[in-house]
Amino acid sequence: MGPAEPGRRAEREHRAEREREPGNRAGPGHGPERSVLVRTPATSANLGPGFDSLGLALSLYDDVEVALTGDGVSIEVDGEGAEVADRGERHLIVKVLRRTFDALDDLAAAGPGQPAGQPKGIRLRCRNRIPHSRGLGSSSAAIVAGIVAARALHPHGDLMDDDAALRLATDIEGHPDNVAPCLAGGLTIAWTTPDGARLVRLEPQVRQVVAFVPEQRLATERARGLLPETVPHADAAANAGRAALLVAALRDGLGDAVLLDATEDRLHQNYRAPAMPESAELVERLRSAGVPAVISGAGPTVLAFTNASRVDSMAARVGNGWHEHPLDVATRGACVVPGEPGRRS
């Protein structure tokens, strides 16, 4: 952090407060309304042994139209989570959009550009398909949507590169395992350094999965609270080997027998099982039938590395109470959908 940054941050925060006062906004939105449509994929993190590191982008998408308007915040939500979604400044996409505008203003002020200030008004039209609080990265999708929209709409959006976007998304989310595949698509290995999060993207040969989504929800914070502060050395060593094997198995398509071994976990799934006993039981039933299956993220969704036809033949083993989602690995991460009306070229 340079010596001028604290003062610049204080000035920015003071400016943001003034801009949000009625009749005193001075940011984008004076001219014709500008909007973008952003599409973000669902993600599955951990994948068994890759705790807080491995992530996979999936072909289930949220769409949000983000528009800079004359004044106020207007939010329309259709689909998953509509009944509980915030409709004002507390909406996650709005908060992330504003934070990204601040970050871009800092970059502009440090270079040849002029800060844009906060948008005068924001309108969101959300079409949510990713189940909320089920371990499929719905919050990461919202965070990434806000960042992608801000980069597209801010006059100096090109000053934030993909690495900086990952660092910002991780700073907001708290860990990179979902935001990384949401941004990059495919299979990602993410880690943190003193300078922020980083990722490596791979194109997996394993392309099909089935997500079993229950009705119950489970907050990530509750799932994390069940984890012990320390684990046996043998368990840590076993997970390290399995995580390395899993990357090779997914990347090279080594088959179900190897994938079944590669998805073994000793660090988190057993500790979290009391909060989602039905999910833990389904994982065991599938694995006993030779299907590589894991808890998706913090749960309670179960992710099986298989195709829909194989699962259909095992309907009795799966049981009732699950919504089956046959999905492909999404090779592309979050993006602005081209050709939408109002998009800034």
Where are these regions (language model features)?
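Short beta-strand segments
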Residues: 39-41, 57, 182-185, 191, ...
